[in-house]
């Protein structure tokens, strides 16, 4: 089996910058140009959101993006088709950056677990992050994903106890994903001055109990915050801030240009 792109990336000694993007936001046709813009400007991994009508952990920015994506006809199947086009260089430069799909379990169950994984691998997906599927309840899912060569990522939060950090670290294929605050994504309520010390202690605790790499997300909006997170973790994830930057775009080309300019500002 060909080595997974994420597995290969995690062997490198570098700090990572991950992008989260909701397909076809804010306008239809934006996905492929945005993927190209993110790749050209140094995104190490691209997370593509799979929109769901009832997200439990998403803030207003991602909820709005998800609703618009759904209104633009985005489905799990259409996302896989877009990934396949991106990998083939159809409609954009050939995308070689690792792609991680992030979304809730219900659409995947409706699609059919093994069918979804087979189609995802065929399309060129490298990994999955399913927030509402805890590791304690996902041994079969994890085994199936690994049999297809897919990386699986699990979430750690500031209240995760040490023994569970070790479990999540063990079950995550290549890396785990740390939420920087106990809040929904993209709320803009991160008091960075007051939270820095708590986040630092939390990530030091994760470092103590995790053997694999971990990235941190939620509330990262600029170069200063990216570098702060790089001091404490192996990577930083920027999602809601990216969606906010491109939200006013009227065309796919404008969306890509806005994404490129913003991503350059983070490096």
Curated annotation (Swiss-Prot):
Write out the catalytic residues in the record.
47, 58
Q: Name one GO molecular function term.
A: tryptophan synthase activity
EC number(s) stated in the UniProt entry for this protein: 4.2.1.20
Question: Keyword Amino-acid biosynthesis: yes or no?
Answer: yes
Q: Which PROSITE patterns match?
A: TRP_SYNTHASE_ALPHA
> Which reaction(s) are listed as its catalytic activity?
(1S,2R)-1-C-(indol-3-yl)glycerol 3-phosphate + L-serine = D-glyceraldehyde 3-phosphate + L-tryptophan + H2O
Entry keyword annotation includes Lyase = yes
Which Pfam family, any one, appears in the UniProt record? Trp_syntA
Pathway connected to this protein: Amino-acid biosynthesis; L-tryptophan biosynthesis; L-tryptophan from chorismate: step 5/5
* InterPro entries in alphabetical order: Aldolase_TIM, RibuloseP-bd_barrel, Trp_synthase_alpha_AS, Trp_synthase_suA
Keywords of the record, alphabetical order, are: Amino-acid biosynthesis, Aromatic amino acid biosynthesis, Lyase, Tryptophan biosynthesis
Please provide, in alphabetical order, the Gene Ontology terms of the cellular component aspect for this entry.
cytosol
How is the quaternary structure described? Tetramer of two alpha and two beta chains.
Main role?
The alpha subunit is responsible for the aldol cleavage of indoleglycerol phosphate to indole and glyceraldehyde 3-phosphate.
Stated family: Belongs to the TrpA family.
Give the protein's recorded name.
Tryptophan synthase alpha chain
Question: Coding gene?
Answer: trpA
